[in-house]
UniProtKB/Swiss-Prot annotation:
Record has RNA-binding as a keyword: no
Catalytic activity: ethanolamine = acetaldehyde + NH4(+)
Naturally occurring in which organism (per UniProt): Escherichia fergusonii (strain ATCC 35469 / DSM 13698 / CCUG 18766 / IAM 14443 / JCM 21226 / LMG 7866 / NBRC 102419 / NCTC 12128 / CDC 0568-73)
The protein's required cofactors: adenosylcob(III)alamin
GO BP terms in the entry: amino acid metabolic process; ethanolamine catabolic process
Pathway(s) served: Amine and polyamine degradation; ethanolamine degradation
Protein name, per record: Ethanolamine ammonia-lyase small subunit
Any one GO cellular component localisation term in the record: ethanolamine ammonia-lyase complex
Cofactor remark from the record: Binds between the large and small subunits.
Keywords in alphabetical order: Bacterial microcompartment, Cobalamin, Cobalt, Lyase
The enzyme's E.C. designation: 4.3.1.7
């Protein structure tokens, strides 16, 4: 699927919702991740700010305009300069700050107040705390007994599409992107005439937990929105794992279709919602997902 097709899907879904299509993602990226390059070191600079990310550490460059253009074209750690064989102080401090931010989002919990504010039913896997979640991934693939009973009692049975939200390895990915991806996703699925299940939040969930959820609720397609393992300085990236007619005993990873890198610096959440709606429709038409789908 090329960019032109994606933009057409976005316009179609947003039009069916009665909303204007979002501006091209390039423009939004330019305003959120790019800033005027800075060349001087400063102890007062916020290491997580756009100014810090735009910092150029190469001293006395032969072609400063080339470095400026390169720095604006990527979020990679380029043009940071050297102090002999070592990185410069500001480059090292930013590296450490980004690493700390990534560790923080793995260890943080999604606040219960936030889940209640979104009106979501909350259930959990067999995991009871974050430490166990990180050390026993197998337990994160199964719902606890209380969760099974809650889903049976409070969720729509036999939906065409069941949407599930889980914290995964990034709390920020859920809390930052939720409002921009779930409402248009739910609206788009309903506009497509599909029977949509009750969305809910799974605490301490792993990807394979969607297999049990699909079996339990009799869903044809299960869509799991889960926080990705964060990279350096990128703690807000969300992934979508979609699977057709999942089964705990037989579904393997190749049966899933994944859309990753959903955030404002990657695939914008609103655009991702439109792509997921189109994906769910094709899964139902082809009765397949993952490598079994025809391109």
């Amino acid at each position: 699927m090329d960019q032109k097709q994606i933009e057409e899907i976005v316009r179609s879904v947003m039009a069916s919702m009665g909303q204007a299509a979002p501006a091209p993602s390039e423009a939004k990226c330019a305003t959120t991740t790019c800033a005027a390059p800075v060349t001087s070191e400063s102890c007062a600079l916020d290491l997580g700010s756009a100014e810090a990310k735009a910092w150029i550490g190469v001293e006395n460059p032969h072609r400063a305009d080339v470095l400026t253009e390169l720095r604006r074209s990527t979020v990679a750690r380029v043009c940071t300069g050297r102090a002999g064989p070592r990185p410069r102080t500001q480059a090292l401090l930013r590296f450490l700050a980004d690493h700390s931010r990534s560790k923080d989002t793995v260890l943080k919990e999604v606040p219960e107040e936030w889940v209640k504010a979104q009106g979501l039913l909350e259930v959990r896997s067999e995991i009871s705390d974050k430490n166990l979640y990180l050390t026993r991934p197998d337990m994160g693939r199964r719902l606890c007994a209380e969760a099974v009973e809650a889903l049976k009692a409070q969720c729509v049975a036999n939906p065409d599409v069941q949407v599930v939200i889980s914290d995964g390895l990034s709390t920020d990915a859920i809390t930052v992107n939720y409002e921009e991806i779930l409402p248009p996703l739910m609206a788009g699925l309903k506009q497509a005439g599909l029977k949509v299940g009750t969305p809910f939040f799974v605490r301490y969930g792993r990807v394979k937990i969607e297999d049990q959820i699909g079996e339990l609720l009799g869903a044809k397609v299960v869509i799991l929105l889960v926080g990705e393992r964060p990279g350096l300085g990128q703690s807000e990236s969300l992934s979508c794992y979609a699977v057709y007619s999942p089964c705990m005993a037989t579904t393997v990873e190749a049966d899933r279709t994944c859309i990753s890198n959903i955030h404002q610096g990657g695939t914008p959440p609103v655009e991702a919602a439109a792509v997921i709606v189109d994906l769910a429709k094709r899964m139902l038409e082809q009765k397949a997902s993952g490598i079994n789908m025809t391109r």
